[in-house]
Every structure is written in structure tokens, then in C-alpha cells.
Amino acid sequence: MVVGQRSSVTDRLLLKAKKMHTLKKYVLALHTQATTLFDDLRAGSVDAVNRGVTRDTYGKGEQFGHELVEKHARTLGLEIRHDHMRNTYMVLPGLDRNAPAIVIGSHLDSVLGGGNFDGAAGVMAGLIAVQAMQRAGHKLNCDVVVMGIRAEESIWFQVSYVGSRGALGTLPASALQQRRIDTGRTLEQHMREADAEPEAVAKGVAYLSPKNVKAFLELHIEQAPSLALTGYALAIGTGVPGHFRFPRVKITGEYGHVGLGRRFRHDAALAGADLSVGLDALWQQWEAEGRLMACTFGEFQTNPARHGMTIVPGEFQFSLDVRAYDDADVAELEQALMTIVGQIEQKRGVKFDFGVRASSKVAKADPIITQQLRDCAQRLSMTVCDLPSPASHDSAAFCAAGIPFGFVFIRNPNGSHHPDEEMSIDDFLQGTAVLTEWLATHG
């Protein structure tokens, strides 16, 4: 090659780099569209009673979210599909319609009185990425599928990843008989009201699989203030914790008179308090050792039908979620829990009934996709860090089904699952630009 003459390979690389930066400009130019999408979503699901928004799983709130994104997708000319769970798929056709697709998305339901961005940001990111590629005239080899997922928030039916596991054929049929906490009606009943097909769940029908999905990409707000405190706008997610859950644990002691001596008591409330203190002490010990875990007592109460100021509590009920980032650690924590429980039962003269157990394995982000996302951010002059997710996400269901996933976090200084959840549109578009470059490079 003549000195000073560029090779055709170099020219192609330079052209590709130029296209990538052009795509970023197209993403950033969609600020108004992104703002409008989030504003419209909030307006249609605002909860005046509980503050924040409520997009109830298989209810009017979640349904509004799906109708909103589907309407927007139609304006972009995307193909619209639904599976037996009534998940929404908005498809940008690729050059090879038979190639495994890239799915990008998240859930559209929320907790009661939650924030507007948890889950929804991942769906909106997919729509903005697709629109940017359309405007840039960028064609991908495979289909890009923006997925609005149903029923991720387990608070409603006490079951994890209902929509995604249903689509993947991994949701157990027993989940159909779980009752929604507010209506008392079963998941099966709610699904039928949404024109879903619960009988397909019972048959284990898989709409998505490693055969037709190349990868799953999820953008999500961080659900802790870590990024805000460290000055990062974005992070690349490295994994989703595994957990075990007991939605309804009951401690049975013995009701007694308020004047009863300590040695005669079988106080169920103090037994619950002992367990909370014991697990918190274990958590402090793990933190001191540099080991990551978390435990949460979401419900924690005596029986309101029988408790009173002058009565020793004979019943106590709580929910428990314990999580960690290694399956061996999760198993160790459950063993430690049962050891503590045995000590409390002997000390207080009470009995624990843990009821139904739910669990999920640790899901590690695909290392190749993770590095590719880091590289995309670097090429776009964005500074990112790695961050393990403190929360559970639909990505874990895809991972368990054998589909690799990648994850991008957006900073959120106020945490999540409450009305003050926060995300700037500028940060959102930066994260979406990273996903868009990944799609353009690897799609």
C-alpha cells in the first residue's frame, strides 16, 4: 500500500463510525417525542389516591400502557403482535426475516402508587431506538422487536416475571390460581379479561425461545441512588440477583393477658422482631465481609382482627424476600434463616409456618454483550461503570430460558417503587443511544 493511502478496510471502519455518531444524533433529536411518551403514560395512569402512578397487572392501568405504546408503534409503521399472555410486540422488520430477532423491552405495569419510569423506560427506549434507525435509514439484518411485557411486578399476584415467563413457556400452571391481592380474583380470570389465553400457560406454550430470539436488551432506571451518588449517568448491568421469597409467613404463639410474666409468654410479635433483628445482623456481617445480599420484610403485622393494647400477640404475619448475587450465597442465606428460626422457636415457644416458597436463580448478563455495551458507550464518549442490579428484572427470565441478555441502567437519585422516582430525559436518551449503537453494530 502506498504511504498515505488508506485501505478500503480503514474507509469502511471510518464510515461505520460516522454512521454510529449519526445514529446518536438521531436519538438525541427525539427529546420531545420521548418526553411526550412519558408524559402521556403518566397522565393515563396517575393515581390520585396513592400519589404517583398505578398500572395494575392485568388491569386498567397496565392495559392503558400497552394501548399507548401500541398506538405510537403504529405511527412508526411497526408490525404489531400479541402472544397468549397479551404481551405487546412492536416489530421493525430486518433484511432476513428468518434470522433470530433481537428483543428490546421491559414491563409496563407498576406497583401501587409507584413511579412512572420503572419498567416503562425500557419499552420507550426500544421505540426511540427504532425511530432513530428509521430516520437514519439504517437497516438491520434481523428483526428488532420492542416488547411491552405484562405482569413483572410480583406484588399483585405474588408471582415473579408472569408475562416474560409465560412468553418463554416457563411459567408454572399453578401460577394461574394465584389471586390478585386487591381483587381476590385469580390470574387466570384476569388474563381472560385481557383477552389472554391462560390455557396456553397450562400447556407450556413458548412464544419466545433461543431459536427465535438472538438476545434480550433491557434498559431500566436504577432502583437505588448509587449512580447519582457516584456521578455516573449510566451503568452497564452485570447481573440480576437470585432470591427466595415467602409471601405469607405465619408465626403462631399464644394469646395472653398483658400482665403475663415474661417466662409464661409465647409472644408471636416478639418472635417476628427477633427474626428481623437477626437477619439484619447477618446482613451487617456480610457487608463487613464485602459480600452482597439484601433482605426485606415487606409486610410485618399482628392479626388486626384480634390484636389489642392489652393482649399478648398470639399470631404474627410477614412476607420475606432474601437475595444475593451467587446461587451458593442464596442457599447459604436460606440455611442461615432456618437456623435463626429454630433458635427463635425454642426461645419464644412459637412455631413458624413459611407457606408457599418462590425463588429465582442468579442471572448473569452475557459477558460478550456486556463488553460490547461498554465499547459502544466508549465510542460515544460516554463514561459508564459496571453495576449489579439490586432488583429483579425480566432479563432473569430470559437468561433462565437460555437467551443471553444485556442491561443498561439510568441514574435515579430517589430510588424506586414510590412516587418520587426520577429520571432525566437527557440521561434516558444517552442510555438509549448506547442501545441503538449496539443494535446497529450487532443486529
Regions found by a protein language model. Give the residues of each.
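A short beta-alpha structural unit
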Residues: 54-58, 294-305, 324-325, 351-370, ...
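Alpha-helical metal-binding/catalytic segments enriched in His/Glu/Asp
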Residues: 104, 113-152, 245-251, 260-283, ...
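Midchain, well-structured core segments that form catalytic/ion-binding scaffolds
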Residues: 152-153, 158-327
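A non-catalytic alpha/beta surface segment that caps or lines the substrate-entry region
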Residues: 46-93
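Catalytic-core environment of secreted peptidases
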Residues: 72, 76, 88-121, 126, ...
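His/Asp/Glu-rich mid-to-C-terminal helical/loop segments that flank catalytic regions of hydrolases
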Residues: 26, 257-286, 334-339, 384, ...
